[in-house]
Curated annotation (Swiss-Prot):
The gene is ARI4. This is Putative E3 ubiquitin-protein ligase ARI4. The keyword Ribonucleoprotein does not apply. Binds 4 Zn(2+) ions per subunit. Zn(2+) 3 binds at C206, C212, C230, C232. Might act as an E3 ubiquitin-protein ligase, or as part of E3 complex, which accepts ubiquitin from specific E2 ubiquitin-conjugating enzymes and then transfers it to substrates. It comes from the Eukaryota. Its EC number is 2.3.2.31. Its cofactor is Zn(2+). Zn(2+) 6 binds at C302, C305, H313, C323.
Length: 529
């Protein structure tokens, strides 16, 4: 054990930058970095039961500010995607008439109400006032026609914005529940409640499968990409609702997933390793050194040029056939396909290797926690009672391993020519690629060292050896944290920062991991929700 740690100390000069000598300073820097990104929770979990309260608080704010009914407030908020600041801005800058008009609201003028009790839809006359219903716009029709209108719209999924039946009236009718069956009324209310999530850019359903029923609300309305953890345990990107994929941008991750799932690389492999039969066009793979090929359909052809030939041949030639001119474009196409295939294989292999390591280390984490708990109960040493150091190390391993895995798709697109062909010269691309891969390699080496130390049977060590292991793990954990931080700074400032396009923003690095969304409480709701 001691000899092993001596060798580790000898390696530290190569793996540890000099500024990492002061461990307390490193931990302080990591905490300060997290505080810079978030001093308060930036997201909230809204349970299915709390959705009504979350929606109600925003409705009340609009109702009080504009002196409108709940129905009118909801219609306005749906129009402006539940963005109260935007709604108030339109009201302040352009007035109430413009605000109402855009949302399909009409101020009721009693003088325009017809005196006759006739329904202009079914043309039935002499109806009692109890058989007719007037909407906020002032238009009045019989209850049967309203019921039919509401029933059709609700069943067609248009319950959130049911317009008045009157000709050219765009007023939104919100009184459906009083005129339809109990079942449809519940469905209508569900549409209105869910609109708080589905029409709201700052609130999204947790993408868990099966669905946990929670929604996540982004408190800070700054447009930045962020990652969040729902109370159900799922971590995901709030912007694209995919799994957490930082340091990849949402577009990079979307393209990478598609590339891994579709047949683009299979096509490249087929181009490199097979030739199409000139008769039936089926792909043929070469298995030996002879250039004479025979398809199952009976067609003979030359492997080198793909042209149809006769049957007679020797190992070195085919009777009556000589390959034509050098087909430069076909050769270039073949070389390009081979190069693309090799490049994709290189990055995918490393991405997959780290994903597989994460799965194995999940078992390691459970084993370590079990050992730590058992030792804290059976041993009297202080170090076993306080084993947060090893939990911190395991969590750091998981966070850094995941960052490493997603850094390979990032490199694939950052330094390829699919997205940034015109953003960098070849020379600049190579320089930046080498610098980034140096950082990536340094992080990778320290992550593997962290993983190796965590595999040690610390539960079998005496007190002195455990203290020594704790010291090494604590230092290495801080090193890995700082390397992750430096990688993100490089990506944000040196790689993505100079680009003109702003579509490749990434979620910020957080030393303590992805933020767990706070529990929603009505008093904490903000106006821009």
């Amino acid at each position: 054990m001691d000899d092993e740690y001596m060798s580790l100390e000898e390696e530290e000069d190569n793996c540890y930058p000099s500024e990492f000598d002061d461990h307390d300073q490193m931990c302080s820097n990591a905490e300060e970095s997290d505080l810079q990104h978030s001093r308060e929770p930036t997201s909230q979990v809204i349970t299915k039961e709390a959705l009504v309260a979350a929606q109600k608080e925003v409705l009340v704010k609009v109702m009080e500010f504009l002196s409108v009914t709940e129905n009118q407030a909801r219609t306005l908020l749906i129009q402006y995607q539940w963005n109260v600041d935007k709604l108030f801005s339109v009201y302040t800058d352009q007035g109430k008439d413009v605000l109402f008009s855009r949302a399909g609201l009409t101020v009721f003028d009693p003088s325009l109400t017809k005196k006759t009790m006739k329904c202009d839809i079914c043309m039935e006359e002499d109806l009692s006032k109890y058989a007719m219903t007037r909407m906020e716009c002032g238009h009045r029709f019989c209850n049967d026609c309203w019921k039919e209108h509401f029933t059709v719209r609700i069943n067609e999924g248009e319950g959130k914005r049911i317009r008045c039946m009157a000709y050219k009236c765009n007023t939104i009718c919100d009184e459906a529940r009083q005129l339809v069956s109990t079942e449809l009324a519940e469905k209508f209310d569900r549409f209105l409640i869910e609109s708080y999530v589905e029409d709201n850019n700052m609130v999204k359903w947790c993408p868990s499968t099966p669905h946990c029923g929670n929604a996540i609300r982004n408190i800070k309305d700054d447009g930045d990409v962020d990652e969040v953890e729902c109370s159900c345990g799922l971590q995901f990107c709030f912007s694209c609702l995919s799994e957490s994929h930082s340091p990849c941008s949402c577009l990079m991750w979307k393209l990478w997933k598609k590339k891994c799932e579709d047949e683009s690389e299979t096509v490249n492999w087929m181009t490199v390793n097979t030739k199409l039969c000139p008769k039936c066009s089926k792909p043929i793979q070469k298995r030996d050194g002879c250039n004479h090929m025979t398809c199952k359909c009976g067609q003979h052809f030359c492997w080198l040029c793909g042209q149809a030939t006769g049957r007679d041949h020797s190992y070195s030639s085919i009777a009556g056939h000589s390959c034509g001119r050098y087909k430069e474009e076909k050769v270039r196409q073949l070389e390009r396909a081979q190069r693309d295939l090799d490049r994709y294989t290189h990055y995918h292999y490393r991405y997959k290797a780290h994903i597989d390591s994460l799965k194995l280390e999940d078992k390691l984490k459970k084993s370590i926690l079990k050992k730590a708990v058992l030792n804290s109960e059976t041993k009297d040493q202080k170090v076993f009672k306080e084993y947060s150091w090893i939990i911190d190390a395991v969590n750091r391993l998981f966070r850094s391993r995941r960052i490493l895995s997603y850094s390979y798709p990032f490199v694939f697109y950052m330094f390829g020519k699919e997205l940034f062909k015109d953003d960098m010269s070849d020379e600049e691309r190579n320089i930046k690629k080498n610098l980034f891969e140096d950082q990536q390699q340094q992080l990778e080496g320290n992550v593997e060292r962290l993983s190796k130390i965590l595999e040690e049977p610390f539960d079998e060590y005496d007190h002195e050896k455990v203290v020594e292991m704790m010291r090494h793990l604590t230092n290495l954990t801080a090193v890995v944290d700082n390397l992750c931080k430096e990688m993100y700074e490089c990506i944000e400032n040196e790689l993505l920062g100079p680009l003109i396009s702003g579509i490749h923003n990434i979620a910020p690095y957080r030393s303590k991991g992805i933020e767990q969304a706070a529990e929603f409480s009505a008093s904490s709701a903000c106006g821009s929700s």
